[in-house]
A protein has these predicted regions:
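Short Gly/Pro-enriched turn/cap motifs at secondary-structure boundaries
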Residues: 35, 50-52, 145, 177, ...
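A short core secondary-structure module
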Residues: 154-156, 209-236
């Protein structure tokens, strides 16, 4: 497949430019970055428009269509980022500095790197005269992903479905290589867990804190709940993605408990990442009680981040909560409920990814993953049920365990070698899918 010789350089320079746009969300302020991308794509022959639900926070949609019908391939990304504390960094987080073969800055991994690779690949192809033989290529770059996508992908899919409708979506979520028992493996995010955050409330009786027994302390009633949550392990539940993951690393998935124990014995770090894919997780994160230090609280609240396997809902979450902490002495109220979703594993897109990995890293394998959180892919799956949406940004120079702590962390950076790798993948995929 044809690829410009300077694709890695073009991607690197574009990423540096994107990092220099401060798009920390909130407030986001994605306008300037999106206008820069618009001009690049427009100059290469794409039909481009910016759509906003609020002023200053546009989403970009770029199209390059064939005259004949065919699949719609969407390369998806977002340009907003989380905050960076400059005092914790070795470089200016918005400098896009190139140091030791890596581009540094907020968004270098999440996910201006992927946006740069997708756009650079698309622009290079278009400038070289490539056009789809059938179907269409869409580049969709969203705002507001880091704050729930209310002004981004969610809004686009719900309010402008005809403009972003796609058969195939490639987004963020996986792609870094990792090793297990001598195998090199690249993950592909094919599903995302649901979010069922809840508040657990205990009741007591207020009183003056100088006489502790005069009241009934609601806060201390949370102690056994916290202890129970601390000791709770994930109830392992059969589902296609973790079973395929186990198969890829050569572990028998017949007994999930034995399988997880085997992985933990061989590589504990992999087990830590695998376990959340296999069932409901419950993580207590916030506590509130009395508003005054000298008042025994009559009510105490514990907030718990609950993540549920794709396709399962509130009833299933509540069942696992009751199993973990019992049923008496408290109330549970769900504050946020989002059902996770998935795409099929065996698809032409997965075949394209496997073929690319074999070309670039002979002998390496590919495995599906479940993203413990969620990304913009979930909105596309929800609104377009037949859409196949995967997360894949291939990284060979920086492995999973080096990359993971840098995402949303200090000194976020990405090797230029991986920028070139990813851009080649998107270029190859576009030509293979659309002709």
């Amino acid at each position: 497949m044809s690829e410009p010789a300077d694709l890695q350089l073009r991607t690197t320079e574009l990423l540096q430019r994107l990092i220099r746009f401060d798009t920390v969300n909130p407030p986001g302020n994605e306008q300037a970055a999106q206008e820069y991308l618009r001009d690049l794509l427009d100059g290469a022959g794409f039909e481009v428009e910016l759509l906003s639900s609020v002023e200053g926070r546009p989403n970009l949609i770029a199209r390059l269509a064939a005259e004949s019908d065919g699949p719609a391939l969407c390369l998806l990304g977002h340009v907003d980022t989380v905050l960076a504390n400059a005092a914790e960094w070795d470089v200016d987080p918005w400098s896009g500095e190139l140091r030791d073969g890596q581009v540094w800055g907020r968004g270098a991994l999440d996910m201006k790197s992927q946006v740069a690779a997708e756009v650079a690949a698309a622009v290079a192809l278009a400038e070289a005269g490539w056009r789809p033989q059938s179907g269409e290529l869409k580049i969709v770059v969203t705002a507001d992903e880091e704050a729930g996508a209310v002004h981004g992908a969610k809004w686009l899919c719900e309010q402008h479905p005809d403009k972003v409708r796609a058969d195939i979506v490639v987004n963020e979520g996986a792609g870094e290589v990792f090793e297990y028992d001598g195998r090199r493996i690249y993950g592909v995010c094919v599903a995302e867990k649901g979010v069922f955050r809840f508040t657990l409330t205990t009741e007591g009786r207020a009183g003056h804190a100088s006489i502790p027994r005069i009241g009934d302390n609601a806060l201390t009633k949370l102690a056994p709940v916290l202890a129970a949550l601390a000791s709770t392990r994930v109830v392992l539940e059969p589902s296609p993605e973790p079973e395929a993951f186990l198969e890829a690393i050569g572990v028998d998935a017949t007994d999930l408990g034995k399988a997880l124990a085997e992985v933990e014995a061989v590589n504990p770090a992999i087990a830590v990442l695998l376990e959340p894919m296999m069932g409901v997780t419950l993580a207590p994160t916030m506590v509130s009680a009395s508003e005054k230090i000298n008042v025994i609280p009559s009510r105490a609240r514990l907030k718990v981040d609950c993540r549920v396997p794709p396709g399962l809902g509130e009833e299933h979450a509540l069942e696992r909560i009751r199993e973990a902490v019992g049923e008496n002495g408290y109330e549970v109220e769900f504050d946020e409920t989002v059902v996770g979703n998935r795409s099929p594993i065996d698809t032409p897109l997965m075949g394209s990814i496997r073929a690319f990995v074999e070309r670039e890293d002979p002998g390496a394998q590919v495995t599906p993953l479940v993203l413990p959180g969620f990304s913009d892919s979930r909105w596309f799956r929800e609104v377009f049920p037949d859409c196949v949406a995967y997360g894949f940004f291939p990284q060979k120079a920086m492995d999973l365990f080096e990359a993971a702590p840098l995402i949303h962390g200090a000194n976020e950076r990405v090797p230029v070698e991986d920028l070139g790798l990813a851009a080649r993948f998107y270029s190859d995929l576009v030509q293979e899918t659309l002709g």
